[in-house]
Curated annotation (Swiss-Prot):
Similarity comment: family membership: Belongs to the SELO family.
Superkingdom in the source lineage: Bacteria
Keywords: ATP-binding, Magnesium, Manganese, Metal-binding, Nucleotide-binding, Nucleotidyltransferase, Transferase
GO MF entries: AMPylase activity; ATP binding; magnesium ion binding
Residues annotated to bind ATP: G81, G83, R84, K103, D115, G116, R166, R173, D254
EC number: 2.7.7.-, 2.7.7.108
Function text: Nucleotidyltransferase involved in the post-translational modification of proteins. It can catalyze the addition of adenosine monophosphate (AMP) or uridine monophosphate (UMP) to a protein, resulting in modifications known as AMPylation and UMPylation.
Residue numbers binding Mg(2+): N245, D254
Gene coding for it: ydiU
Protein name: Protein nucleotidyltransferase YdiU
Active-site residue list: D244 (proton acceptor)
Cofactor(s) required for function per UniProt: Mg(2+); Mn(2+)
Catalytic activity: L-seryl-[protein] + ATP = 3-O-(5'-adenylyl)-L-seryl-[protein] + diphosphate; L-threonyl-[protein] + ATP = 3-O-(5'-adenylyl)-L-threonyl-[protein] + diphosphate; L-tyrosyl-[protein] + ATP = O-(5'-adenylyl)-L-tyrosyl-[protein] + diphosphate; L-histidyl-[protein] + UTP = N(tele)-(5'-uridylyl)-L-histidyl-[protein] + diphosphate
Length: 484
């Protein structure tokens, strides 16, 4: 790997230098060929294994943990920071630079009495979801590899330590700006320094002045709205949408007790530590705006409040428009050129009525959408009908759908288009759990198979049909904990 060290050299007050502590008996558990290409790597090697496991120095790396704060479950925590993630620097690749971080690399000054380690199950889950979201077309950080060990760590019970090698276009979070506004009062110069660095690194077309700052914040609002529209369309619940888990680039970031929907539930809670459902699936759009408001609050020393509010007011429109684009594609509805607000509302109601039907009939979210690839939209009889219990209610919806759909002249092409946007394979929690159990038993084959299938989520892959099925009873609606 070839590194540059812009964050390390230009923002010395934004991190603490800390070196990883190696794990014992390191070994590869998973490797992403796709992610490796981003930083010009080929195959995993012994030299790379030693370096990324913290057992040897990586040439050109500057090891550091970033400091930030954040709102966690609605309350402000004044000092967080990378408690178990150590960044090596920005690795250069054919299409730009990517931060390389060792998640689980050992304790840092921000560990808050933690051991700085990640357990194997959480490392595997982060690897799989990073791959899954990327291949579904959802903006996300990437995972290069998972490195296992025989090092014991204790959570609810004894587990083994592992490291996820994460790649990110940036590790700058909403919480970085909050820290230098709230926790380090009177440090407007640091906010400006961080803003200028962010613009030069990631928005070089914007000027480092008030006009550039305003344009940047509007872009963050729009990118966040688009990200959450993706989550709602694909059926993904993040689970811990704290402001310190929000990327300023609009990438999915910092995965914990996430879940893809099995049976559709509008307010599905995937996090055992969220009994009130603050971060439930259906709450994500509102939380996205709430988090942006906290970011805006942190930026008031450098951007006038009226300009911040004007940008925040664009959030709902950006969210709805991107969500409509994604959902119209799933349903096969033509995009309306210069659609009116009334037409958009009609489409939202049509989509909403269908998801309500899904929930009432306890249908699998992804599998139901996939069935549109078998639908003959020109037929008055829908092959979907047999999936529903309330047939009259479905018939009323389907008639309205056909009216909105209009005439389809090439049914086969229409069906293929549906299969290109409605995935057959998603990362169901029970599949991840089965792969983790197999890894614990020394069998990597299920993990490797699941990983390869998730790289082509829209392909039929008939030899892997079992991975597209609804979960067994024990795997329905699995709720994970924040313990990792």
């Amino acid at each position: 790997m070839k590194f540059k060290q812009d964050f390390f050299t230009q923002l010395p007050e934004f991190y603490a230098q800390v070196y990883p502590q190696g794990i014992s008996n390191p070994h590869w558990l998973a490797w992403s060929e796709d992610a490796a290409k981003l930083i010009d790597l080929q195959q995993p090697t012994d030299v790379l294994l030693k370096g990324l496991s913290g057992n040897a120095a990586v040439e050109g790396a500057s090891y550091y943990a970033q400091v930030y704060s954040g709102h966690q479950f609605g309350g402000y925590t004044p000092r967080l920071g990378d408690g178990r993630s150590i960044i090596l620097g920005e690795a250069l690749g054919p299409q730009g630079a990517w931060d390389v971080a060792l998640k689980g690399g050992g304790p840092t000054p921000y560990s808050r009495h933690g051991d700085g380690r990640a357990v194997m199950r959480s490392a595997v889950r982060e690897f799989l979801v990073s791959e899954a979201l990327h291949h579904l077309g959802v903006p996300t950080t990437r995972a290069l590899a998972v490195i296992g060990s025989d090092m014991p760590v204790w959570r609810e019970s004894q587990e083994t330590a592992a490291i996820t090698v994460r790649l990110a276009r940036s590790h700058i979070r909403f919480g970085h700006f909050e820290f230098f506004c709230h926790s380090e009062r009177g440090q407007a110069d640091k906010l400006t320094q961080l803003l200028n660095f962010t613009l030069k690194q990631h928005y070089p077309h914007l000027s480092c002045d008030l006009a550039g700052y305003k344009a940047w914040f509007l872009q963050v609002v729009q990118d966040t709205a688009k990200l959450i529209a993706h989550w709602q369309a694909i059926g993904f619940a993040h689970g811990v949408m704290n402001t310190d888990n929000m990327s300023i680039l609009g990438d999915s970031f910092d995965f914990g007790p996430f879940a893809f929907l099995d049976t559709f539930q509008e307010y599905f809670i995937c996090n055992h530590s969220d009994p009130e459902g603050r971060y439930a699936f259906g709450q994500q759009p509102g939380i996205g705006l709430w988090n942006l408001q906290r970011l805006a609050q942190a930026l008031t020393p450098v951007i006038p409040s009226d300009d911040l509010i004007a940008a925040l007011n664009q959030y709902q429109h950006a969210l709805v428009q991107h969500y409509l684009m994604l959902m119209r594609a799933k349903l096969g509805l033509a995009e309306r050129a210069d659609s009116t607000a009334e037409q958009d509302q009609q489409d939202l109601e049509l989509i909403g009525r269908f998801t309500v039907l899904m929930e009432k009939n306890q249908l699998d979210y992804s599998n139901t959408w996939r069935r549109f690839g078998q639908l003959d939209p020109s037929s008055a009889h829908s092959s979907l009908r047999d999936d529903f219990i309330d047939l009259n209610e479905f018939d009323v919806w389907y008639q309205a759908y056909q009216v909105r759909l209009g005439k389809v002249t090439d049914v086969e092409a229409w069906q293929q288009a549906r299969n290109s946007v409605n995935p057959k394979y998603i990362l169901r929690n029970y599949l991840a759990q089965e792969a983790i159990i197999a890894v614990e038993e020394g069998n990597l084959a299920p993990l490797e198979r699941l990983h390869q299938v998730l790289r082509q989520p829209f392909a039929e892959q008939v030899e892997h049909e079992d991975l597209a099925k609804r979960p067994p009873d024990w795997g329905q609606g699995l709720i994970m904990s924040c313990s990792s």
